[in-house]
Each structure stands twice: as structure tokens, then as C-alpha cells.
């Protein structure tokens, strides 16, 4: 990945999957995120985070958002597309957030102006049900705490299912090395046979 970031034209928009990577299940470590940030800064790339599975990697919203916070603290201007379709079970409701992070007030105003134009022309009246559910969960302390517990349960179940699949494949003597199943994170797994 580092080689690809270095080879990309300076100032490229780089889409980064925040956590529980789809389709590989392979997430960068914190040390790898630091290196990714260094290369993105050197090449003057623009990071755009896809945050579709927050909470599914570790069961902890804050832990899963570490890379975004690191980039923000490092002073990056960036975008984050955050979906609540999976982690709040709001499939088909189009519930999510778009975050633009900048330390420049003029840039923020310009981006907001463009987003308002796009929103008005593209989705003048978005579905409200999913947004209201998400807002209720995010703004009510009791619901928010319950949601965080549910995410821990779901991610724990995913981890347990990975272990059980791995153990069954080993028990059956299935040819190959299946350790990637328990090393990967989230709902997705990629196995490449060369």
C-alpha cells in the first residue's frame, strides 16, 4: 500500500477504509496508519475515509475511529463518509454523515456552500426515518450506551465465528493454511491462493 501511495500522482484523493476492511478483513495497525499518514503528507494527498463498519472491528467505536482522529490531530484536511446502515442496522435508510475536516475557516465555508448546493439538487428531501433513528441513538445517553454494548456483542460474535470456522477447517484436515481467518477483522475475509 505504501508503494501505491508513493506512486500516486501528488495531490491525489486517497480513499481509506477506516476499519473492518471490505473485502479483505485486513486493517492497518496503528503503526502502519502512522506510516500511511506520513506518505500522504509527503505526497500532499487528500485522505477520504470510508467509515462503513465502525464498531465491527474491535467492538469499540473510539478504537475503530483511531485513524481518523490521528489524521485530524496531525492537521490533515480530509473527508469522512460515515454510514449507519450496518452498525445501526439501518439498511436501505441512507442514514449517515459526511464530515469535512479543515482548520481553515474560509475553506470550511466554501465546502459547506458546495455541499448545500449538492444536497439541494441531488437529495432535496432525503428519507427521514433512518436519520431520526440514528439521531435518537446518538443523542440519548441510554440508547447510545446500549448501542455500544450491542456493537461489542456483534464484534465478539464475529470473532467467535471466525475462531469456530478456523477450528472446523483444521479439524476436518482441510488443505491449506487457514490462519488468515482469525488474523483478519470484521465480517469480511480474503484468501488469495498463489
What are these regions (language model features)?
Residues 1-56:
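Active-site phosphate-binding strand-loop segment of PLP-dependent enzymes
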Residues 25-30, 57-65, 91-92:
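A short acidic (Asp/Glu
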Residues 29, 33, 64-68, 112, ...:
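Amphipathic alpha-helical segments in well-structured domains
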Residues 33, 55-64, 117-124:
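Alpha-helical subdomain
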Residues 35-37, 64-77:
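Short, electropositive alpha-helical surface patch
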Residues 73-148:
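Conserved core segment of the aminotransferase class I/II
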Residues 146-194:
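Conserved PLP-binding catalytic core of the aspartate aminotransferase-like
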Amino acid at each position: 500500500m505504501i508503494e501505491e501511495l508513493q506512486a500516486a500522482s501528488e495531490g491525489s484523493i486517497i480513499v481509506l477504509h477506516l476499519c473492518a476492511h471490505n473485502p479483505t478483513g485486513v486493517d492497518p495497525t496503528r503503526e502502519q496508519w502512522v506510516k500511511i499518514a506520513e506518505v500522504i503528507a509527503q505526497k500532499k494527498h487528500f485522505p477520504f475515509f470510508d467509515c462503513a463498519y465502525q464498531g465491527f472491528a474491535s467492538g469499540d467505536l473510539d478504537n475503530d475511529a483511531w485513524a481518523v482522529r490521528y489524521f485530524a490531530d496531525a492537521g490533515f484536511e480530509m473527508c469522512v463518509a460515515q454510514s449507519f446502515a450496518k452498525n445501526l442496522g439501518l439498511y436501505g435508510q441512507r442514514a449517515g454523515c459526511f464530515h469535512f475536516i479543515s482548520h481553515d475557516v474560509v475553506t470550511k465555508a466554501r465546502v459547506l456552500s458546495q455541499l448545500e448546493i449538492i444536497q439541494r439538487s441531488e437529495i432535496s428531501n432525503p428519507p427521514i426515518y433512518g436519520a431520526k433513528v440514528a439521531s435518537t441513538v446518538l443523542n440519548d445517553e441510554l440508547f447510545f450506551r446500549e448501542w455500544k454494548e450491542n456493537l461489542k456483542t456483534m464484534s465478539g460474535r464475529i470473532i467467535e465465528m471466525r475462531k469456530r470456522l478456523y477450528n472446523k477447517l483444521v479439524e476436518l484436515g482441510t488443505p491449506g493454511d487457514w490462519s488468515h481467518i482469525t488474523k483478519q477483522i470484521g465480517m469480511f475475509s480474503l484468501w488469495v491462493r498463489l
